[in-house]
Amino acid sequence: MAKKVLVVDDEKLIVKGIRFSLEQDGMEVDCAYDGEEALKMATENHYDMILLDIMLPKMDGFEVCQHIREFSDMPIVMLTAKGDDMDKILGLEYGADDYITKPFNILEVKARIKAIMRRTAGSQPKKEDSKVIEAGDLRLDCESRRLFILNKEVNLTAKEFDLLELLVNNLNKVYSRENLLNLVWGYEYPGDVRTVDVHVRRLREKIEKNPSEPKYVHTKWGVGYYYYQN
């Protein structure tokens, strides 16, 4: 089955170029030119990837991303201006999985999309390999990709789940940010290690009673992160 991608940008020439290139690779591409249209399409369809510009009419990309995260963990890649680090951080804070800076090379876009799709597909366990992982108060159902804390479900994005699953599967093992970037985002992922910090912070906000004094995901200062259990 062809992968389905939603491309959102108010610059029609950019959308046209991305659409043509992705369709050449056998993907099915839908297009939206403003935030409200994008949110409507994301609500009514499932996409394997959403390419989402930040500067959009009617509703900006941050708000669109935030709304999508209320009901879906579809992978979202934000299109940001070159050198605008704040936009990159905000995009990740609002739930984006990755970002690509403009102007970009279409080959980079295609490579990034394929890398994330491979990672997302690889994180979906087969039924015969499904399992439930328990660590203290946490229970991860790896088949349905659902997290429960004290039997109460906590909604995670795809990357948040992948990150937590890796740490819980390796209790008390410290991973550097570079290792986590490689293992969770893929070895070909060319992103910034700050991506890891933002996802850890978001994860703590969801699973920790007091994120500033974490019970589960700990920091080994100067080294990296680990899931603590006695």
Residue ranges and their predicted role:
Residues A32-E36, K88:
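Conserved Asp/Asn-Gly motif in the active-site loop of CheY-like receiver
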Residues S130-V132, N155, V200, R204-N230:
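DNA-binding patch around the recognition helix
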Residues K4, A115-V174, E178:
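Short, Lys/Arg-enriched segments at the junction into DNA-binding effector domains
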Residues H46-L51, L56:
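Active-site beta3 strand of CheY-like receiver
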Residues L13-Q24:
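Charged docking surfaces used in two-component/phosphorelay signaling
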Residues K58-D60, Q66, E70, P75-E134:
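Basic, amphipathic DNA-recognition helix from helix-turn-helix-like DNA-binding domains
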Residues D9, D53, T80:
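Active-site residues of response regulator receiver
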Residues G26-Y33, M41:
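Short hydrophobic/Thr-rich beta-strand motif most characteristic of the beta2 strand and flanking loop
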